[in-house]
Amino acid sequence: MEGTDLLLAGVLFLFAAVVAVPLAARLGIGAVLGYLLAGIAIGPWGLGFISDVDEILHFSELGVVFLMFIIGLELNPAKLWQLRRSIFGVGAAQVLFSAVILGGLLMLTQFKWQAAVIGGIGLAMSSTAMALQLMRDKGMNRNESGQLGFSVLLFQDLAVIPALALVPLLAGSGDDHFDWMKVGMKVLAFVGMLIGGRYLLRPVFRFIAASGVREVFTAATLLLVLGSALFMDALGLSMALGTFIAGILLAESEYRHELEIAIDPFKGLLLGLFFISVGMALNLGVLYTHLLWVVVSVAVLVAVKTGVLYTLARIYGLRSSERMQFAGVLSQGGEFAFVLFSTAASQRLFQDDQMALLLVTVTLSMMTTPLLMKLIDKLLSRRFNQPDDEDEAPWVEDDKPQVIVVGFGRFGQVIGRLLMANKMRITVLERDISAVNLMRKYGYKVYYGDATQLELLRSAGAEAAESIIITCNEPEDTMKLVELCQQHFPHLHILARARGRVEAHELLQAGVTNFSRETFSSALELGRKALVSLGMHPHQAQRAQMHFRRLDMRMLRELMPVHSDTAQISRVREARRELEEIFQREMQQERRQFDGWDEFE
């Protein structure tokens, strides 16, 4: 693809994403499905703007590569050892049982047994990119079903190596066509990467960090990710697996958080590119020609994988509600099928349109997953949000909530317990199923679902409540809820959690003045204790804390309309000088009046 064509493709990708994803979000079908539909629209079977799908699809796998690197950073060898039962137990069982069932069904549809084996293995894999994105959207990454889902995906990535090695064996039906020397070299290169990464990465990043140039650190991070991916690709292995291992090797290093920050902006955009490319790869010609076969195949694929996953989750001990989410989120075919089926086709394992039919089935199964998850959400909402006639009478006469608490993580739990202890009537909205189950046991009135949906807010009693406390993890959800409440429930007194100064500015601009930055108060309190431990009188430390809080809040309001970095830095320096002057005056006053507490305490 030439430079001009590549630039045009980039513009088309961005345009399609900007148009399709907001429309999909407004329709409630999710960003992932929006990306897929955008890909169909601009691909060879849509408007035909882009025809070189294979090259773009290979490039777009970088989105999955960046995602797996960040996941690797969040783990460490000790955590992986803890997950060994779920990785090599549930993960291996899922691939084995799904591959056997699906491969057997393919043999019934006139696939040769060799093609059926490869087809079964490829269809048994799930989409790492889609599943992880949906798990994050649904809050599953905070509960056991999310950890189990990640374990299954990790085993599937590990299964890439033997699956690809199996293709030439099946194609040649003997050892004559199989180069054991080449396989041995690949294994040695892989082991060399592990050993080299273990002993070289930290010193290299220590040397780069010592330069103090942030751009060089970002460049080194990109070099590591892309280099690992290229190395694994040259070995004929999974690029995502290579970057995942690189992430694990750096998971316990002091540079972990800095690496996450450097990579994060690229991850989201490239993931979107991947989903658009998958949509472009959908062969609508094959779909039209074999419509009935494809529809039945998609239904069977999703049903078989859902059944296998649900059964394994039950054996593992997940609750029924978590089983449904776990089975649904991994029910689709995955991106690895594109690689495996292409390799098999190059070895002439497939006949006629067999490969095209399998790829269309995989692509359409990926498009069904967001819809299936919405259906599961509705079923769970019905189960958890309808009144239970067998419940005991509430301990307050008026059943209408005074306060709605959105999100019941560590931040929301403290607020909820304080309100309950003071006999306030609260209703909690939470999308983590395990948290909903737990809270109901302890007598909380909880609604399961996405609080940014207007109907859920109505069901929770927003029209009768006095206040709403928003403690969402994602700032986007917080701002969407603020807008929703201001538009439909203007009487509600809005209180919100801000993760930092940027979110605080956004809340102020939206007219929300009652917010709390999640680490600010606790950091101030610890700072006060530090001053006391260093010999400062408790009275003086308390006043220092008070002045700092007051000045910081004033700065927050003053800097809200300022967008220039230079202007912000200048204002921060002025504020620091002002704070020093206040502390100097306070010290002089304390020398004159050392004891006693004033009206501010």
UniProtKB/Swiss-Prot annotation:
For this protein, the record's Gene3D superfamilies field holds:
1.20.1530.20, NAD(P)-binding Rossmann-like Domain
The alphabetical list of record keywords is: Antiport, Cell inner membrane, Cell membrane, Ion transport, Membrane, Potassium, Potassium transport, Transmembrane, Transmembrane helix, Transport
Location (main, coarse):
membrane
Pfam annotation, one family = TrkA_N
**Which regions span the lipid bilayer?**
5-25, 29-49, 55-75, 87-107, 115-135, 152-172, 177-197, 207-227, 230-250, 261-281, 284-304, 326-346, 356-376
Q: Where is the RCK N-terminal domain?
A: 400-518
Keyword Ion transport in annotation: yes
Signal peptide bounds: none
Query: Is this entry keyworded Transmembrane helix?
Result: yes
Q: Which PROSITE patterns match?
A: RCK_N
Disulfide bond residue pairs: none
Example of a GO MF term: glutathione-regulated potassium exporter activity
Q: Where in the cell is it found?
A: Cell inner membrane
Q: Provide the topology term for how it sits in the membrane.
A: Multi-pass membrane protein
InterPro entries for the chain = Cation/H_exchanger_TM, K/H_exchanger, K_H_efflux_KefB, Na+/solute_symporter_sf, NAD(P)-bd_dom_sf, RCK_N
**One Gene Ontology term, aspect cellular component:** plasma membrane
Mention one GO biological process in which this protein takes part, according to its record: proton transmembrane transport
Query: Subunit notes for this chain?
Result: Interacts with the regulatory subunit KefG.
Role, per record: Pore-forming subunit of a potassium efflux system that confers protection against electrophiles. Catalyzes K(+)/H(+) antiport.
Q: What is stated as this protein's family in its record?
A: Belongs to the monovalent cation:proton antiporter 2 (CPA2) transporter (TC 2.A.37) family. KefB subfamily.
Identify this protein by name.
Glutathione-regulated potassium-efflux system protein KefB
Per the UniProt entry, what species is this protein from, by scientific name? Enterobacter sp. (strain 638)
